[in-house]
């Protein structure tokens, strides 16, 4: 697993050395909500001008997730698709949560709001997938 992440990171950093967008993940609201969900999801991401996206955050199951994908932007809107780690099954109060695989597909819709002191709030919607609920997420980003 570490080798796969290292390979993805090397490929990502090796192919893009120009302007990028850096972002900070803050947290989200899950719906439907459940008591086991962690809504504080600090993390960071980088997205190249070509759309390659790589990030990490503290996830719903209180694990570190690393993701890689591609973001297609059209105006203030974005659509990201890729793969993510950190959602292997976890038993909480006798109930199993998670997807059962090391790598899970991920998709997110986003809306970048106007900049405020050099940072743009980013609203994201991650649709439900299998047993995982939908998430409305907040991040802030800055383009270089």
Place the predicted regions along the sequence by residue:
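Extracytoplasmic loops and strand-loop junctions of Gram-negative outer membrane beta-barrel proteins
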Residues: 91-95
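Outer-membrane beta-barrel initiation region
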Residues: 17-48, 85-87, 107-110
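Residue-level signature of outer-membrane beta-barrel architecture
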Residues: 46-48, 72-74, 111-115, 142
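Long amphipathic alpha-helical scaffold regions
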Residues: 76-84, 142-144
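Cleavable N-terminal export/targeting peptides
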Residues: 1-21
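Membrane-embedded beta-strand positions of outer-membrane beta-barrel proteins
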Residues: 22-26, 52-56, 77-81, 109, ...
């Amino acid at each position: 697993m570490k080798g796969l992440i290292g390979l993805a990171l090397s490929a990502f950093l090796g192919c893009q050395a120009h302007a990028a967008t850096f972002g900070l993940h803050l947290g989200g609201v899950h719906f439907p909500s459940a008591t086991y969900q962690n809504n504080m999801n600090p993390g960071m991401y980088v997205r190249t001008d070509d759309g390659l996206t790589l990030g990490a955050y503290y996830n719903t199951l209180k694990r570190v997730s690393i993701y890689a994908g591609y973001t297609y932007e059209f105006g203030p809107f974005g659509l990201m698709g890729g793969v993510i780690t950190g959602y292997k099954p976890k038993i909480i109060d006798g109930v199993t949560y998670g997807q059962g695989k090391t790598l899970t597909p991920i998709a997110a819709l986003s809306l970048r709001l106007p900049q405020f002191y050099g940072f743009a709030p980013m609203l994201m919607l991650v649709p439900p997938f299998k047993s995982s609920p939908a998430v409305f997420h907040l991040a802030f980003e800055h383009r270089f």
